[in-house]
């Protein structure tokens, strides 16, 4: 039964990791540089499933080492190499996630395939440094026991502690601290979420004229239109009472309809006066004088009066309301689209980080009993000896 279960796990490991490598190498959407970590990690797991687990299974079932002693030494070194590489890969992936979340703009520009390959090479070098000492320095092995040969890990205390710290405890501590830091960053950004949803980003504030309460959603358009109608009625009333002065530009310091304490509206930068409201073609066919809503005749707030003029995209509309200047149609779509793309990218990063945290948590729980009992045997071999079956 044990042999059947282990054989199934071997085949499942090979098949699943081969699919991961195939997906990353053939799918365009998965060709991001950071996915090279997954390719290297999958390769390490395949090597464990093909070169390590079958011989371990044979050793457990037979009760002794059936193969040559030279292969036993190579087998133990490869065991430490591949398992250490797998764990350190997860540590490198967690650091990559942390840099991608905490230094998004700076790190994404540096996250090139060359840089990722250098990190992967460093991971394999660390694993090699930990796994090669038993091959180079064999130490005092003592008299060989008679009877059936055995293939066991190095029993010297210094190597047990050094390899356990380098292979598991240090990477595990780094991963826990890194994911704790990522969680705090995600929690802080979540607390800022309501404010971010109520107003656009800095770049979008410039595009929308820094509206005092942010760009309105489609649900607020009826209220926006009613305010606009009220503003136009006030403008027509001011024309009939002679309050509007012909020929004045927004740059004029004595603009009527605006309190003297408010700064004048800036020019459009092209030497021409910007229309803040552009009516429909049917209305423009009528009286042009009545269809134009001059900025100085609309009672605007100080925040919108101080804001720069709108850079109106082609085919978009500009509305002047009591709450500031707002771009409609394609203008709003462009600004909000960029904002939502950034939000979607951050959401994907958080989701991927959560999945990796679950995988790493399960991985750590699976490895912890072995490394704990392995290290405990080196610290107090007489009084803290772990039973062979449990080990």
Curated annotation (Swiss-Prot):
Stored InterPro entries: ADR_fam, ADRA2B_rcpt, GPCR_Rhodpsn, GPCR_Rhodpsn_7TM
Keywords: Cell membrane, Disulfide bond, G-protein coupled receptor, Lipoprotein, Membrane, Palmitate, Receptor, Transducer, Transmembrane, Transmembrane helix
Annotated site residues (Implicated in catechol agonist binding) in this chain: 163, 167
Chain positions of site Implicated in ligand binding: 79
Compositional bias of kind Basic and acidic residues: 233-247, 271-281
Similarity remark: Belongs to the G-protein coupled receptor 1 family. Adrenergic receptor subfamily. ADRA2B sub-subfamily.
Protein's recorded name: Alpha-2B adrenergic receptor
């Amino acid at each position: 039964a044990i042999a059947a279960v282990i054989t199934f796990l071997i085949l499942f490991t090979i098949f699943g990791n081969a699919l991961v490598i195939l997906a990353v190498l053939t799918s365009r959407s998965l060709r991001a540089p950071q996915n090279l970590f997954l390719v290297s990690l999958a390769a390490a797991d395949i090597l464990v499933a093909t070169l390590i687990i079958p011989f371990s299974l044979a050793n457990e079932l037979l009760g002794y080492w059936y193969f040559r002693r030279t292969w036993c030494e190579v087998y133990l070194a490869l065991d430490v190499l591949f398992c250490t590489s797998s764990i350190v890969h997860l540590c490198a992936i967690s650091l990559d996630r942390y840099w991608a979340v905490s230094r998004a703009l700076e790190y994404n520009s540096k996250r090139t395939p060359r840089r990722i390959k250098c990190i992967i090479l460093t991971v394999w070098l660390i694993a090699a440094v930990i796994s090669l000492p038993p091959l180079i320095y064999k130490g005092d092995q003592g008299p060989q026991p008679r009877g059936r040969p055995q293939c066991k890990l190095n029993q010297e205390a210094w190597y047990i502690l050094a390899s356990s710290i380098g292979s598991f405890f240090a990477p595990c501590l780094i991963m826990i601290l890194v994911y704790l830091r990522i969680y705090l960053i995600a929690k802080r950004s979540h607390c800022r979420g309501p404010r971010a949803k109520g107003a656009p980003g800095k770049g979008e504030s410039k595009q929308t004229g820094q509206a005092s309460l942010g760009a309105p959603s489609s649900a607020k358009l009826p209220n926006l239109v009613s305010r606009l109608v009220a503003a136009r009625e006030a403008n027509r009333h001011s024309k009939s009472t002679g309050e509007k002065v012909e020929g004045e530009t927004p740059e004029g310091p004595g603009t009527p309809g605006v309190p003297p304490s408010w700064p004048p509206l800036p020019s459009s930068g092209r030497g021409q006066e910007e229309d803040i409201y552009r009516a429909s073609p049917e209305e423009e066919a009528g009286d042009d004088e009545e269809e134009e809503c001059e900025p100085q005749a609309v009672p605007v707030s100080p925040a919108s009066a101080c804001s720069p003029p709108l850079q109106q995209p082609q085919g978009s509309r500009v509305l002047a309301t009591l709450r500031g200047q707002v771009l409609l149609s394609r203008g709003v779509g462009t600004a909000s689209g960029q904002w939502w793309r950034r939000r979607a990218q951050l959401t994907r990063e958080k989701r991927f980080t959560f999945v990796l945290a679950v995988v790493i948590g399960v991985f750590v729980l699976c490895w912890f009993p072995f490394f704990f009992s392995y290290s405990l045997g080196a610290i107090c071999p007489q009084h803290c000896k772990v039973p062979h079956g449990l080990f």
